[in-house]
Swiss-Prot record:
A motif (EAR-like (transcriptional repression)) lies at residues 155-159. The keyword Nucleus applies. SUPFAM superfamilies: beta-beta-alpha zinc fingers. GO terms for biological process: cell differentiation; floral meristem determinacy; negative regulation of abscisic acid-activated signaling pathway; regulation of DNA-templated transcription; regulation of flower development. GO terms for cellular component: nucleus. This is Zinc finger protein KNUCKLES. Changing residue 43 to Y: In knu; induces flowers that are conditionally male sterile and contains ectopic stamens and carpels that originate from placental tissue within developing gynoecia. A zinc finger (C2H2-type) spans 38-60. Contains a slightly degenerated ERF-associated amphiphilic repression (EAR) motif, which may be involved in the activity of transcriptional repression.
Length: 161
């Protein structure tokens, strides 16, 4: 069979030359002959050069530094949604969380008040001027979970020097 013209490319096997039909081994600079691999200490990746490994580990270093900064910010800020503390929840609670309430299993879970059960709820004006907040968390006052004013307070609001 005749040899293909020189412009024809062989993608399947190693390149042949006209002068000899010997196979030439490909040596790539990306894969050195020593076949030494440099493993990353933080993930399962391996690299052929120490420089590539160094750059990769610098990326891990930056990720860890950013995570430490974020943890410091979160540790110094108050908890936003902590179910163990009592906080005001201005949005209606349409379902009962099965993980809140009694852990003994003998006591029934207390139903939280919702906006749908409160008197005077208007779905077209859901934010009245005096908003009835629902309380969650430990509420030991025996109430129904709605803040109510018993009597107006006599507060002295005058400023004196």
């Amino acid at each position: 069979m005749a040899e293909p013209p020189p412009s024809y490319l062989h993608f399947v096997g190693p390149a042949k030359t006209r002068s000899s039909s010997k196979r030439h081994s490909f040596s790539s600079s990306a894969h050195p002959a020593s076949h030494r691999l440099f493993p990353c200490q933080y993930c399962p990746r391996k690299f052929y050069t120490s420089q590539a490994l160094g750059g990769h580990q610098n990326a891990h270093k930056r990720e860890r530094a950013a995570a430490r900064r974020n943890l410091g910010v979160l540790a110094n800020s108050p908890p936003i949604l902590d179910d163990n503390n009592t906080f005001l929840r201005p949005y209606p609670c349409f379902y009962q969380n099965p993980f809140q309430g009694s852990t003994s299993g003998n006591e029934p879970l207390q139903e939280q008040p919702t906006m749908m059960t409160m008197d005077g709820y208007d779905p077209f004006h859901p934010y009245p001027y005096v908003y009835p907040f629902a309380l969650s968390g430990n509420n030991n006052d025996g109430g129904n979970g709605v803040m109510e004013e018993d009597e107006p307070l006599d507060l002295d609001l005058s400023l004196r020097l």
